[in-house]
Amino acid sequence: MSKVASIVDVLQGKVAIGETVTVRGWVRTRRDSKAGLSFLAVYDGSCFDPIQAIINNDIENYESEILRLTTGCSVIVTGKVVESPAEGQAVELQAEKVEVTGFVEDPDTYPMAAKRHSIEYLREVAHLRPRTNIIGAVARVRHCLSQAIHRFFHEQGFYWVATPLITASDTEGAGEMFRVSTLDLENLPRSENGKVDFSQDFFGKESFLTVSGQLNGETYACALSKIYTFGPTFRAENSNTTRHLAEFWMVEPEVAFATLADNAKLAEDMLKYVFRAVLAERKDDLQFFEKHVDKDVITRLENFVNSDFAQIDYTDAIDVLLKSGKKFEFPVSWGIDLSSEHERFLAEEYFKSPVVVKNYPKDIKAFYMRLNDDGKTVAAMDVLAPGIGEIIGGSQREERLEVLDKRMEEMGLNPDDYWWYRDLRKYGSVPHSGFGLGFERLIVYVTGVQNIRDVIPFPRAPRNANF
């Protein structure tokens, strides 16, 4: 019995010329020659390229099955690995046996039958779109990046912590949260004042899907020193844009005894590590993106890993923008949150490199960010990258209980709702820092794919929860 091999192993020369091997996958194309040969391009998702299988018409099921094969049919091909005389790949399979495990019922109505589909159409058939070149490449890059992130933190001595998806806390204080409830919507229990009585709900109180694992992560950082979370988060933000999802993944490290400067260094080291990994491990997919999606993909990543990060205070960044002579769609003044056009100007035109903007006005940042001595700004940072703008947001956390309480009061938050978070400041409080990286935003940057809905398997967005 021949050994089963992935197509990537065969194409990369891990199977010797002359060895008989079995590959299993799906037909991308079939073409027939007048000389009684059929050529199947078979892929299994292990790499970008398919392998070519050459089938003689003397194979027993040639007339009955091979000539019926169309795009999407599943096959098991056993054959000898031979050198390929054609350009494009070094080896091909001289088929000795082809087992058809599944035909496409009606090739004329198979959604993936056409050679080219619009990316918008593919969203409507998200259950089949992994079979396309572009979404298959995105999936492999996504896997590579996630593994590189875990590897980076493991090598740096971090512990991965699983933070809850159901929470009673609003980390961002923005109120854009999905409610979790088992109450009967047709017959809601109400208290004497007419409000919904959440004490009768499953958790005995209001609960929501988390917008961030940060607050829970901080509790473990204040015991294990260096931790990170990596999981799904949810925002009930009614934004139908190419940059927003209702469900997305976040990478959130937290480090005890770390300053804002330590935080910026960690962000730089992590980004460069994962970009080096994807350049080394997914060259085939990046070359596809470079050819068909964004010609600057590889150059952008190479420039990033070879750049020193610039750093600038928010106040100085506002000054740079005001003196730039450039007319921005959103006017610039001290106290505004930088828009994408401002961020990209700083990274692409002014610094021409990644840049860390730090020390933002307190009024535009979250309650947990450490108040600076000037009383007007907080120790917050954003990492801006050429080609996309903000890619990471983080801060040194407020470790002083009285200052934290005052910030909560200013923002209309009830300290009692955060009693456990406040406890961290009562019992051996330490300076600590962390950041959040939107994982899908990272994939957009790496692949050049413009719409964030195309870099997550099943996008969740306003009025869209199919599949």
Swiss-Prot record:
Uppermost EC category: ligase
UniProt key word ATP-binding: yes
UniProt-listed SUPFAM superfamilies: Class II aaRS and biotin synthetases, Nucleic acid-binding proteins
Principal subcellular localisation of the protein: cytoplasm
UniProtKB keywords: Aminoacyl-tRNA synthetase, ATP-binding, Cytoplasm, Ligase, Nucleotide-binding, Protein biosynthesis
Superkingdom as given in the UniProt entry: Bacteria
Matches recorded under InterPro entries: Aa-tRNA-synt_II, aa-tRNA-synth_II, aa-tRNA-synth_II/BPL/LPL, Asn-tRNA-ligase, Asp/Asn-tRNA-synth_IIb, NA-bd_OB-fold, NA-bd_OB_tRNA
Localization of this protein: Cytoplasm
Catalyzed reactions per annotation: tRNA(Asn) + L-asparagine + ATP = L-asparaginyl-tRNA(Asn) + AMP + diphosphate + H(+)
GO biological process: asparaginyl-tRNA aminoacylation
A GO-annotated cellular component: cytoplasm
Quaternary structure note: Homodimer.
Entry's family note: Belongs to the class-II aminoacyl-tRNA synthetase family.
NCBIfam families: asnS (TIGR00457), PRK03932.1 (NF003037)
UniProt name for this protein: Asparagine--tRNA ligase
Organism from which the protein derives: Haemophilus influenzae (strain PittGG)
High-level lineage: Bacteria, Pseudomonadati, Pseudomonadota, Gammaproteobacteria, Pasteurellales
Gene name of the record: asnS
